[in-house]
Amino acid sequence: MDLYLQVSLASSKLLTKAYSTSFSLGIRTLDEKVHDPIYAIYGFVRLADEIVDTFHDQDKAALLQRFREDTYRAIEEKISLNPILHSFQWAVNKFG
């Protein structure tokens, strides 16, 4: 696993732990092989949820549209400079 993917997965794990301690604890009960993809998926969903629930002074529709486009591009190109999207595209391309 390359360094950028490791850092991206660590970012997803950090985001998950920061936003949901109970979810993070639940993941630990699962087989360790599935931890990274679960953190990657949760991190992705958390970003989308953050757009909807938090950025009230922003154009949420535009942010969601950009996030959608960035997500599809990351999956197609198998890379993103956004570490959360990079780990998500990895999970999609590896397990999807």
Roles of regions detected by a PLM:
Residues 1-96:
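Acidic catalytic motifs of isoprenoid enzymes
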